[in-house]
Amino acid sequence: SEHGGLNETFADVAAITGDKKYLELARRFSHKIILDPLIKDKDRLTGMHANTQIPKVIGYKRIAELSQDDKNWNHAEEWDHAARFFWNTVVNNRSVCIGGNSVREHFHPADNFTSMINDVQGPETCNTYNMLRLTKMLYQNSHNPCNINEPDPSYINYYERALYNHILASQEPDKGGFVYFTPMRPGHYRVYSQPETSMWCCVGSGLENHTKYGEFIYAHQKDTLYVNLFIPSQLNWKEQGVTLTQETLFPDDEKVTLRIDKAAKKNLTLMIRIPEWAGNSEGYEITINGKKHLSDIQTGASTYLPIRRKWKKGDMITFHLPMKVSLEQIPDKKDYYAFLYGPIVLATSTGTENLDGIYADDSRGGHIAHGRQTPLQEVPMLIGNPDSIRHSLHKLSGSKLAFSYDGNVYPAQKSKSLELIPFFRLHNSRYAVYFRQASEEQFKTIQEEMATAERKATELANRTVDLIFPGEQQPESDHSIQYEASETGTHKDRHFRRAKGWFSYNLKIKEEASQLMITVRQEDRNKAVILLNNEKLTVHPTVSKADKDGFIRLCYLLPRKLKVGSCEILFKPDGTEWTSAVYEVRLLK
């Protein structure tokens, strides 16, 4: 169960009531299996359900905040450290360009993003919702490593990236539906909720997401105001008697204007953020009432430009954000790249065909884009080296951001060039955010390898009636997991379940099935008795050749076809202490 937020809830009750017994409960509800490695700077997150862990860490941080002055409990500093380490490892090692994380709701290996590219169940919106909550908490008592008098800019950099590219992209602009999974698989699409059919977790958090665009634009400390984000807004800073208006068309236009609408007669400091994507100081010129403001602008690392003076009504501060195109490689350094303009992730439409279930129905998997998976060799591949690819993307004229790619693309485009727009504006379409890159020499070999792998995967998917990934929370819940003396784990970055007693699932049979395929390790092939509806499966399986990691597939030709409906499959030891560790259960036509 996703129990992660219980510790934060009790901590909040402690803050509201002033009763420390609730704070003690919050500490007791804090999951040590997650906490202890984080305190020691160890990332043990692979294989864990992502959005169960993030709320736990929010709780660690909240408890640390409320325990600073507790003389009977001296762990506040290390719990705060655990939250910061978690944030750093998820953001820097486990997140893709849009700021999201996880595949099929679970943390995949930090050094292997293959599943992120291949799977249609990409980053979950709830994860990013909670990562932004954690980001806001950590920012408020952070310090820039290069300037202890400023907050740490890394928190704003992430917040901005995730806000524009995942949160803003997670609501369909016409009907208002919310997105659960945002596939990073090139050529796939998102599914949108509907009021009558969908009440997912990402609908609940989605209702909040799109009310909070204003919460991180500004921050204040004593007589200093931080301008963090470039979003049209009005601020009423009651404590200092200041009202301020920010006007901008960012990201379509680089110009930002701050207008003082009301000011007290005293000195105040404006801290204007210089983001890391600004690159260099060329073009980052600030004027106050039309006159150039001279200042030592630090660039190359995100920081703030301080302006201290006695402000008056009508003062105008104007500056331009020097945005440029960049190319960002997927974190595991495979040959997949994303284009960004400043902090804005760009994407291309790959068609509007076969958008099956784009508006969700009320089925258990209605939030998943089940339509045809475009073979990866059919989506745009960029031919050339990364530097030449970056220089082949050109900004088009016009009021809205749009770009044209005039480099070498395979397959050749129907139009003369590939067109890209901000991902948050691309809806009701298949899309590509990440593009495979290859040199001229690599291209032919890669195409052949991708085509072979895709053909095999497509053939298997087309034959699949039902599929379970044992050890993963959602697939097991969907198939009514039951067990006795059983455990889960991971091996070679794959989830498994095994038992000293037994474990069972309810297979969902949507059409007649004639074969059962079980994935185990080679050394585990004869360790389990399999029962279908309490009847022992006695046929001998055909055994596939072991793959490079030692996994094999046992394929059983069923003596009788399974009819439409449901069927219990149960595993128990076959004269051994444990059953096989089962990695995949697949029912085939």
Predicted regions and their residues:
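Aromatic (Trp/Tyr) and acidic
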Residues: 3-21, 25, 50-89, 108-274
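C-terminal beta-rich recognition modules with glycine/proline-rich loops and embedded aromatic residues
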Residues: 26, 157-165, 170, 174-259, ...
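Amphipathic alpha-helical segments of tetratricopeptide repeats
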Residues: 31-35, 88-92
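Active-site-adjacent structural elements in folded domains
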Residues: 39-47, 113-121, 304
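Flexible glycine/proline-rich, aromatic-decorated loop/lid segments
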Residues: 94-113
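Beta-strand-rich binding/interaction modules
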Residues: 265-288, 516-518
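Beta-strand-rich ligand-recognition modules
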Residues: 292-314, 320-334, 483-515, 519-589
